[in-house]
Regions:
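A metal-dependent hydrolase signature that marks the N-terminal structural subdomain at the beginning
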Residues: 1-48, 178-179, 187
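Well-ordered, non-membrane alpha-helical segments in soluble/globular domains
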Residues: 7, 80-82
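Compositionally biased, charge-rich terminal segments
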Residues: 12-35, 83-97, 135, 144-157
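Active-site scaffold of zinc-dependent metalloenzymes
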Residues: 42-79, 92
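Post-HEXXH active-site segment of zinc metalloproteases
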Residues: 60, 73-80, 91-122, 144
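An active-site-proximal "capping" alpha-helix that borders the catalytic cofactor pocket
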Residues: 119-132
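Pan-zinc metallopeptidase signature
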Residues: 140-187
Length: 187
């Protein structure tokens, strides 16, 4: 664990707290709603999404819900995930709660062709790639293992098989990497 990672993470937490609508972090295990969502996802994905409470971070409005083990994760990992999740906070602000429920959950379908969810998640995964490049270099963002993981999430049960088009996901990854590689280096 590096001191720079801790400072970066703590700085982001301070930014989150200073917002007009502060962003808060809560444990999923402290919420009945999160337990209900976990149970519903297990049923809807035929057991495919069985790690919602233990491995996944979820944003609803200005609350970022984390697993009970969140504090055990490295500062670097938490920072990367929060950057991804803050995209979802901005989406809630842009589209409102009813809009997010409709776009994320039902447009045009809840599974298989969940274009709305795929677009919202892609916006956040593009930031995931940007943060990888910022912190660990372009080679880390270009890692085929990371790309395979992103593809698996889009096409598998993690998000309810939201977008079955692997080629589309890989094309978006490639476009994002090209855009990142053309940016001037950060100081």
């Amino acid at each position: 664990m590096s001191d720079a990672d801790r400072q970066r993470y703590e700085g982001l937490l301070e930014e989150m707290a200073r917002r007009d609508a502060p962003v808060v972090i809560r444990r999923k295990t402290d919420s009945r709603l999160q337990g209900f969502i976990d149970s519903a996802l297990r049923v809807l994905t035929l057991g495919g999404q069985d790690r919602y409470l233990t491995d996944y971070v979820t944003t609803l409005g200005t609350t970022i819900w984390v697993p009970a083990t969140w504090e055990d994760w490295s500062y670097r990992a938490r920072y990367k995930i929060l950057r991804h999740e803050l995209v979802h906070v901005q989406q809630f602000e842009r589209f409102t709660w009813p809009g997010m429920v409709l776009i994320y959950g039902f447009f045009p379908l809840p599974a298989g062709l969940a274009w709305g969810r795929a677009m919202l998640e892609w916006e956040a995964y593009a930031v995931t790639l940007e943060v990888e490049a910022e912190l660990d270099g372009l080679a880390a963002a270009a890692d085929p293992g990371l790309h395979d993981e992103i593809v698996r999430r889009f096409t598998g049960p993690d998000y309810g098989w939201m977008w079955p088009f692997e080629g589309w996901v890989r094309m978006r990854i490639a476009e994002t990497l090209t855009a990142i590689s053309r940016r001037p280096p950060m100081p």
